[in-house]
């Protein structure tokens, strides 16, 4: 690993974290194609799908840790949601990340291709949820616990394979299917995604899929760029950026599908 490769990783990580912070979509779905294709395209180094997913798991872990820390005293992280969805997504992500070692590179790219299409669709679905409801720490949140656990387990399994946290799928499900209040969803999804990233990180490290120097570079860039993106996102109209990003992710999905077929 030379300076050119580290610099390339820093730029990729900064762009991914900045966009992630700006429009509120998980960094993994953005960084995966950039890490997979850009280093080899510019001739600095080629990363495998397993290595990319391992690096992503570490980045998501530290990114969500920062979010959970920020919300720790808000009273909006719902303990019941964490018990049911958090434990399920943790188990799913451990299993997914561990068994991803046995999945071929084409198999991992196939899964990303499916999730990329889902991500594009979810970007344009209006976020519902119980906007009009104020929520306090003592107020009970009503939801289907077994449905929530089952969906979280599935999301964890798939996210563990890709080294993602799964927030870009988790949030719409919590809002539209489980009908969780918006503020509780935002705070609790960070905690649930954090647990998912723990499982993914453990599985990836155990199976030797993590390159620690690139992971460290992306961790640093996410801590720097994500807050900047979030600040900018509050001041500008991000709809156009969402549209452009959807086109890029969609194009990546098409490229992956063409390589697989």
Swiss-Prot record:
Belongs to the 4-toluene sulfonate uptake permease (TSUP) (TC 2.A.102) family. Keywords: Cell membrane, Membrane, Transmembrane, Transmembrane helix, Transport. It is found in: Cell membrane. It is a multi-pass membrane protein. It comes from Bacillus subtilis (strain 168). GO terms for cellular component: plasma membrane. PANTHER family: MEMBRANE TRANSPORTER PROTEIN MJ0441-RELATED, MEMBRANE TRANSPORTER PROTEIN YRKJ-RELATED. The chain crosses the membrane at residues 10-30, 51-71, 80-100, 106-126, 151-171, 186-206, 210-230, 240-260. This is Probable membrane transporter protein YrkJ.
